[in-house]
UniProtKB/Swiss-Prot annotation:
One of its GO terms (cellular component) is bacterial-type flagellum basal body, distal rod, P ring. This is Flagellar P-ring protein. Residues 1-21 form the signal peptide. InterPro entries: Flag_FlgI. The lineage of its organism: Bacteria, Pseudomonadati, Pseudomonadota, Gammaproteobacteria, Enterobacterales. It comes from Salmonella choleraesuis (strain SC-B67). Keywords: Bacterial flagellum, Periplasm, Signal. It comes from the Bacteria. Pfam families: FlgI. Assembles around the rod to form the L-ring and probably protects the motor/basal body from shearing forces during rotation. The basal body constitutes a major portion of the flagellar organelle and consists of four rings (L,P,S, and M) mounted on a central rod. It is found in: Periplasm; Bacterial flagellum basal body.
Length: 367
């Protein structure tokens, strides 16, 4: 009996070290409480000669003519305006949940013409619309550009992006979105990642605190919670629920590969079984030279001919089998993979082959 209790205590201690508590607010979001995208088209003025070349971007000139017409200024027909201080831009913003009229939000300004830089520019009043073509905000202000660049004598240097910037609190909410919050007797909590175990643990935690039947797990991502009627009551109820803590079990073993950048990221649950790996390097070198052949005798009537000479060299190196030991934790996995001496691009192929052979104990996701 004493031996059994001791073993049970050891098992519980191990489980406690594997699981850790997190708040429900960090694991879920409230269904329907989300941001909405806004977009608009406008003009940026005040650029130091780095704006659109209006002869190549006719929409910039057309927009400027329309704006001046609305301000009571008529541009003579046929006028060829060659401006350098104006740029056509797209303006985007996120409409936050529960936004009220008069509230300010940040906007992102991006050049859509051939402007060289938006540094020092001012965005003129731009209406921001939603997917329903209704205007929800008005944007205007000075643009903050994080990049810097300089050019002289045909040489140039640039740090970061110059054709995009941000205006902090650059838009004012003019129209409020209707919300259904507080109208019903149930609210759905959406898990950030689908997990049947986590959905059931959140359900059990709410039922223990609020009584049986207060929460129901609908699927691996949705937990439905019964709430009192009224906005203020639901706000207090959700505030209490979101601060509850639940034990988070170890996540699924996963390896994420970015095929564009060659980066490989894996979590701590990844393990390896013993296997042997042979990775050969194949290199192709193409050398092309242009030879100029001229006639030997001057004035002989011959022609100068340019003939290309191409040389292709194909080499293959490596390919010897290397043993990969069984690894039970992330540090061991890293050491085992580093021992192969493979580049990140080679490592992508190796991990795919390991999974096909059943040696990689993890899900493989390629983005």
């Amino acid at each position: 009996m004493y031996v059994f209790k001791a073993l049970a205590g050891i098992v519980l201690a191990l489980v406690a070290t594997l699981a850790h508590a997190e708040r429900i607010r960090d694991l879920t979001s409230v269904q329907g409480v989300r941001e909405n995208s806004l977009i608009g088209y406008g003009l940026v003025v005040g650029l130091d000669g780095t704006g659109d070349q209006t002869t190549q971007t006719p929409f910039t000139t057309q927009t400027l003519n329309n704006m001046l017409s609305q301000l009571g200024i008529t541009v003579p027909t046929g006028t060829n305006m060659q401006l350098k201080n104006v740029a056509a831009v797209m303006v985007t913003a996120s409409y936050p949940p529960f936004a009220r009229q008069g509230q300010t939000i940040d906007v992102v300004v991006s050049s859509m013409g051939n402007a060289k830089s938006l540094r020092g520019g001012t965005l003129l009043m731009t209406p921001l619309k939603g997917v329903d073509s209704q205007v929800y905000a008005l944007a205007q202000g000075n643009i903050l550009v994080g990049g810097v660049g300089a050019s002289a004598g045909g040489s140039s240097v640039q740090v970061n992006q110059l054709n995009g910037g941000r205006i902090t609190n650059g838009a004012i909410i003019e129209r409020e979105l209707p919300t259904q919050f507080g109208a019903g007797n149930t609210i759905n909590l959406q898990l950030n990642d689908e997990d049947f175990t986590m959905a059931q643990q959140i359900t059990d935690a709410i039922n223990r605190a609020r009584g049986y039947g207060s929460a129901t797990a609908l699927d691996a991502r949705t937990v439905q919670v019964r709430v009192p009627s009224g906005n203020s009551s639901q706000v207090r109820f959700l505030a209490d629920i979101q601060n509850m803590e639940v034990n988070v079990t170890p996540q699924d073993a996963k390896v994420v590969i970015n095929s564009r950048t060659g980066s490989v990221v894996m979590n701590r649950e990844v393990t390896l079984d013993s296997c042997a790996v042979a990775q050969g390097n194949l290199s192709v070198t193409v050398n092309r030279q242009l030879n100029v052949n001229q006639p030997n005798t001057p004035f002989g009537g011959g022609q100068t001919v340019v003939t290309p000479q191409t040389q292709i060299d194909l080499r293959q190196s490596g390919g010897s089998l290397q043993s990969v030991r069984s690894s039970a934790n992330l540090n061991s996995v890293v050491r085992a993979l580093n021992a192969l001496g493979a580049t990140p691009m080679d490592l992508m192929s190796i991990l795919q082959s390991m999974q096909s052979a059943g040696c990689l104990r993890a899900k493989l996701e390629i983005i």
